[in-house]
A protein has these predicted regions:
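N-terminal active-site segment of His-dependent metallophosphoesterases
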Residues: 1-74
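Non-catalytic terminal accessory segments
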Residues: 1-3, 299-521
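Beta-strand-turn-beta hairpins that frame and shape the catalytic cleft
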Residues: 1-9, 20, 147-162, 192, ...
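Active-site-proximal beta-strand elements of phosphoester/diester hydrolases
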Residues: 5-19, 157-168, 198-200, 261-266, ...
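Acidic/histidine-rich helix-loop elements
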Residues: 12-45, 110-116, 169-175, 211-216, ...
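Active-site glycine-centered loops adjacent to acidic/histidine catalytic or metal-binding residues
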Residues: 13, 66-67, 99-100, 202, ...
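His/acidic metal-ligating clusters that form di-metal
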Residues: 56-61, 159-161, 170-261, 322, ...
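Extended active-site neighborhood of metal-dependent phosphoesterases/phosphodiesterases
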Residues: 74, 79-182, 188, 256, ...
Length: 521
């Protein structure tokens, strides 16, 4: 039976924060000043996004995939529910998932009064279903009550699987085995009835970059490597996610040959404040996604900037402060690192190693790095004269913007790209000379070039606007072909031959140091 194309609007991670819980004073500043989230103005950002969505006539379906509130504050829930009701009154159909930021196990969270943190009521997990049942569960054709997951018939031939992953009963996010059996039964029923499945959950199943997979592994969906293959083999080919605050689209293919696209949308409350629109058209085997940024006027002072410039300034300021702290104050760095999904204990563990490098980093320029990589890049000083004085810290900020914003700031032809890859090739050559495989250390990539290069350039699916082919589904017992990987653009940077000389010089320096110690001590 022919299916009419279905269009949906997607936002996530609104982190709504009630002003009643405090937006000024030393306690608030200490807790939130170094965050990428613009909590103080989360209401203004959400209202601007919803005004824009109300005026968008492409669809009446709006999906929110979790972390609706900042930390589960009862006041925040009450206020955001009224804003969601107002969106429904405009004629929109609104479907909401809650997630880990929407409740506290003890029913308490922090508010800020002057210099003090004061405990206030927060929602407990068991309260959330009734609080949000008018945004999805009330019209569900199936509900898994314990996980608060539900299935809705969005239109003829289309079902939404809203899969709550806030716990898997094994100490992680994700789905319990019992919940997954329910998902499996619902997927089988959908396929039997010729229903196209659109799924949404909160935590990502595919990391937006190798670096994120290493430092933010605990922020991925629990058992993601297994679950993403299982979901693909259930016929769930498209899943909408959030949590990372990174705008990204990625894809995996299961061993059986089935496909899963993870379409991640960045947070409304941080850079770049996107609204994603997706059109599903099974009859032509195509899904298209486009991204709009919040452009409605917001009710706070942007200090002469556009909204995106203001949010970018917030993000970059946080990164610069982190790099400064890395060279001077490891406890402060540990406190700040949680805003980027980096665990405090990891910072304390490697802080001694980070500190001396961070001190040098704060004074380093691209020109100085370029001199080290001339043999690899073939660049002459006049080739990079326009960027020679650019701070490496500013360049790192560009990479963070690249990651969170889903942008593609550098191509393989840009000198910043060549210089960075040249440096990474030198590092790889040192490890090769030492016969050490980088994967043993970094776990998620075979080389340091493969580990860091995706921060420079996205050679995969565009994060903002993309056409995604709907691929065939293979039942159990069938075997599909894995699609050919797209070739990466040719890069002119040569592999480095400096590894052996660097290792030899290092060994000689160590021998000389030991001899001096023996002679004088």
């Amino acid at each position: 039976m022919a299916k009419t194309p279905l269009t949906v609007t997607v936002i996530t991670d609104t982190h709504y924060y009630s002003k009643k819980t405090g937006t000024k004073g030393k306690a608030y500043d200490a807790a939130n000043a170094k965050s990428q989230k613009l909590l103080k103005y989360s209401e203004e950002l959400l209202r601007a996004a919803f005004k824009q969505i109300k005026e968008d006539k492409r669809t009446d379906i709006v999906l929110l995939s979790g972390d609706t509130t900042n930390n589960g504050e009862i006041e925040a829930h009450a206020e955001v529910i009224e804003i969601l009701r107002d969106l429904k009154k405009s004629g929109k159909r609104v479907y909401v998932l809650t997630a880990t930021h929407d409740y506290q196990d003890d029913g308490l969270t922090d508010s800020f009064v002057g210099n003090e943190k004061v405990k206030i009521p927060a929602a407990k997990r068991e309260q959330l279903y009734d609080m949000y049942k008018e945004f999805g569960p009330d019209e569900a054709i199936a509900v898994h009550r314990d996980s608060m997951s539900y299935v809705v018939q969005l239109a003829d031939g289309y079902r939404l699987f809203a899969l709550n992953d806030d716990r898997n009963l094994s100490g992680k996010s994700g789905f319990s085995d019992e919940c997954f059996e329910w998902i499996k039964a619902q997927a089988e029923d959908a396929r039997k009835n010729d229903q196209f499945i659109l799924a949404m959950t909160h935590h990502p199943l595919i990391a937006p970059s190798p670096i994120y997979e290493l430092i933010g592994k605990n922020d991925m969906l629990g058992d993601y490597e297994t679950r993403r293959n299982e979901l693909a083999d259930l016929g769930i080919q498209f899943i909408l996610t959030g949590h990372t605050h990174v705008h990204d689209i990625d894809v995996i293919t299961s061993d059986r040959g089935n496909t899963l696209y993870d379409i991640a949308t960045a947070a409304t409350v941080g850079y770049p404040a996107p609204i994603r629109t997706i059109v599903f058209d099974p009859d032509v085997k195509m899904v298209s996604t486009t991204t709009d940024l919040i452009t409605e006027t917001v009710d706070f002072d942007l200090e002469g900037k556009t909204l995106q410039e203001y949010l970018k300034y917030q993000l970059i300021g946080m990164v610069k402060d982190m790099i400064k702290a890395a060279g001077t104050d490891i406890p402060t760095l540990a406190d700040m690192a949680t805003a980027m999904s980096i665990k405090k204990k990891l910072i304390y563990k490697i802080g001694w190693l980070i500190k001396p490098f961070a001190k040098k980093l704060n004074a380093l320029t691209i020109g100085k790095v370029a001199k080290l990589t001339r043999a690899e890049t073939g660049l002459k000083p006049e080739d990079y004269a326009d960027i020679a004085d650019k701070s490496v810290v500013d360049f790192i900020c560009d990479l963070v913007v690249n990651l969170y914003g889903g942008e593609d700031l550098y191509s393989v032809d840009d000198n910043e790209y060549k210089i960075t890859v040249g440096l990474l090739h030198i590092v790889d050559s040192v490890f090769a000379a030492l016969h050490i495989k980088p994967r043993k250390l970094i776990k998620v990539a075979d080389s340091f070039t493969d580990f860091a290069e995706p921060l420079l350039h996205n050679s995969g699916i565009p994060s903002y606007d993309a056409i995604l082919p709907i691929r065939p589904f293979y039942k159990e017992g069938e075997q599909g072909k894995k699609p050919q990987e797209e070739k990466k653009p040719e890069c002119s940077v040569k592999k480095s031959k400096k590894g052996v000389p660097i290792v030899v010089c290092g060994i000689l320096a160590l021998i000389i140091l030991l001899l001096l110690l023996l002679l004088f001590f």
